[in-house]
Amino acid sequence: MSQKIDHQKPNIVLIMTDQQRADTIAELGHPWMQTPNLDRLVKQGTSFTNCFVTSPVCVSSRASVFLGAYPHTTNVYTNFETWQPNWVSWLAQAGYHCVNIGKMHINPYDAKGGFHQRFFVENKDRPLFLEDHERALYDEWDKALKARGLEKPSRYTRVRDDRDAFLKNLGCFTWETDDDMHPDNFVGDTAVWWLEDRKASSPFFLQIGFPGPHPPYDPTDEFLAIYKDTEFPHRAASQQELAQQPKMHQQLRQSMVDFNIDSVAWRENLTDEDIQRLHRYYAANVSMIDQKVGQIMDCLDKQGHLDNTIVIFCSDHADALGEHGHIQKWTMYDCVTRVPLVFWAPDRVKQQQQCDDLVQLMDIAPTILQFAGIDPPSNWEALAMNKMLTSGCWDEQDPNEKLRDHVYAELGRDHIQSGA
């Protein structure tokens, strides 16, 4: 791995949402969505329509991205193993100023992870743990809410205020306090503030982690109204499909019913209207994030960075949203393991290219390093996509010479998957 400091290297902005499905960007063939800013990235960049995660949960997927390997190599199989990134510090050694704003899911949460600065936001629906709890956490968003004298909405406040409504809402709530204190707005605004306030001229690596559209599905009224009359092409699973699923999937569905994970009070025997409600709230949260992506792009332009910046948009895994009777993650269905992946950099990345070749989300790691002039480790399982980004997908060059001919995901057993 060789490194050379060069202040003409491109800035790199990695935007990662949490739990966003691949069918949530209008320009990629999903007209029920309203995502003008993500559409712009797609039109002016290269998007991968078959990008699959290495694990269908947050921490193990992110560890693969930031360690360049599958979970069986990183030894991070669930959301509870300790880990930190390795290649962020390599960017720092190569002259990059490295900043994380929002969700990273490093464990422990407040570890540096190779970043010069971290403004982390992790606990969208979790209480402030007691100080003697092994996962005690008080993040930037908690501090901002406290400074404004606001109580953070969570499953605890919602059960306290209206238990019956909580149990019937399937995790769908309208944001209850100041709009700018919604965690996705807070993260997006913090990223804009950092870009506006920065005075240094060295290249930067900015990782922006939006907490949404991970549940609770809690958009503001403004964005929920956009989807008031939208009909989504998704329907409830049949009783026949549910009965034919393996025992571990039946037990997983029951765990969702029993434990109200992340404010989602799940139930069996959903109706089509239940599915439509889930997608309306979820899509509204995606559109909120889309607006913030647009504001970040505008700020990069205003600050004079846009011509020398690579923007990458992706998500750590997706969400079943009622498909196959499941909610959230933990399964290997396509609707959970396939995620959006878009590269934008007009002078460095081929424009208006939609690539159907198989890639893994972790492949962005060596790709970023190569853009920064750093040779990725030869023993990494992640593979660089730079040739595809600059010269075209393999099916346009040599169909027999693909980056991957298969993708692979894995997951360890935890307290949620009692039947695994």
Language-model-derived ranges and their functions:
Residues M1-A420:
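Formylglycine-dependent sulfatase
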